[in-house]
Each structure stands twice: as structure tokens, then as C-alpha cells.
């Protein structure tokens, strides 16, 4: 935020908010980007996930200008070299994005690099918890390259243009 302020640009907004209640005016955004956050609406509200997810997209569409773009970034598997989901909730969410909301999808690798296995274990355990870290470290789902530990990560990128009339 401070870097943007120093550039004297006036066409940007940064805010922390619930995806279901975004504190900005209608039709103000050319692009809405959500990184690793909408999935938590599904995870934390699974008994009513479709209703809550629709609130998110109603809100995104409210703030998006006609012809604008929605870009969603989410995990497609930590500890895997190719996209793979162990989580059934995420599978439902991603299928909903693609089949019901008609988002396009691609995937990229976004691997993590650590100086040694102890550093990898400590940071992964803090961020991802014991189950996933144990799976990665104990099952040796990592690579050693140039004295570094590489943890594979696949990331999904979903996008679509606004359906609002211009």
C-alpha cells in the first residue's frame, strides 16, 4: 500500500474485507482479484456453501464494471507436481466455478523453496498444519536441488469477464 501511495496514482484501492461485504462503491473495479480467500467461505460455511458463495459473486458483480474481469487464485495441491486435490470441499467449489459460473481455468506451478529440511518443516507446519506437513516431509514429497528443498505447489487461476451489459 505504501509503495502505491508513493507513486501518486489515484486509480487503486486496497482493503481487507469479507468477500461477501466489500466496502467499495458499485461498478468501481475494472478487475477483481481474489487470492486464496474465497475457498475459505466454502470451508468455513460448508453446510450453506452455495448460498454463501453466491453472496460472494453477487458482491463481486456489484463492484465490477461492465466488461470487467474476475480473477480467482486458489490451491490445486501443496506437495504435488501436478494438480491434485485431496479436499472434497474444494473439489465441489472448483466444479461450481467451472460448471455453474462458467469460469475458465488454468494451472501454474508455484513451488516453495527452503534452505534446508528443518526450515521447510517449521514453516510448512506453521502455515499448513501437521497433517499436510507430515505427508510432505515424511513421504518425501519434495525435491532437493542446489542445496535447497523445493516443495511442489500447484496453483489454479480461474477467470471470466463480467456478464453485465456495457
Briefly describe each language-model feature range.
Residues 50-66:
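A short glycine-rich, Lys/Arg-flanked "PGG" loop and its adjoining helix->strand segment in the class I
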Residues 68-99:
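Conserved class I S-adenosyl-L-methionine
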Residues 30-52, 76:
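A short SAM/SAH-binding and catalytic strip from SAM-dependent methyltransferases
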Amino acid at each position: 500500500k505504501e509503495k502505491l501511495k508513493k507513486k501518486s496514482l489515484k486509480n487503486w484501492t486496497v482493503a481487507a474485507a469479507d468477500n461477501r461485504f466489500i466496502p467499495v462503491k458499485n461498478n468501481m473495479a475494472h478487475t477483481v482479484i481474489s487470492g486464496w480467500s474465497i475457498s475459505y467461505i466454502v470451508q468455513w460455511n460448508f453446510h450453506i456453501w452455495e448460498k454463501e458463495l453466491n453472496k460472494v459473486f453477487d458482491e463481486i458483480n456489484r463492484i465490477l464494471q461492465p466488461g470487467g474481469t474476475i480473477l480467482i487464485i486458489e490451491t490445486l495441491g501443496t506437495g504435488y507436481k501436478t494438480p491434485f486435490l485431496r479436499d472434497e470441499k474444494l473439489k465441489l467449489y472448483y466444479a461450481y466455478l467451472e460448471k455453474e459460473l462458467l469460469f475458465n481455468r488454468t494451472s501454474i506451478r508455484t513451488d516453495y523453496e527452503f534452505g534446508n529440511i528443518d526450515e521447510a518443516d517449521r514453516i510448512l507446519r506453521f502455515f499448513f498444519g501437521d497433517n499436510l506437513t507430515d505427508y510432505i516431509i515424511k513421504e518425501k514429497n519434495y525435491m532437493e536441488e542446489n542445496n535447497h528443498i523445493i516443495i511442489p505447489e500447484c496453483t489454479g487461476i480461474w477467470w471470466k469477464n463480467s456478464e453485465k451489459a456495457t
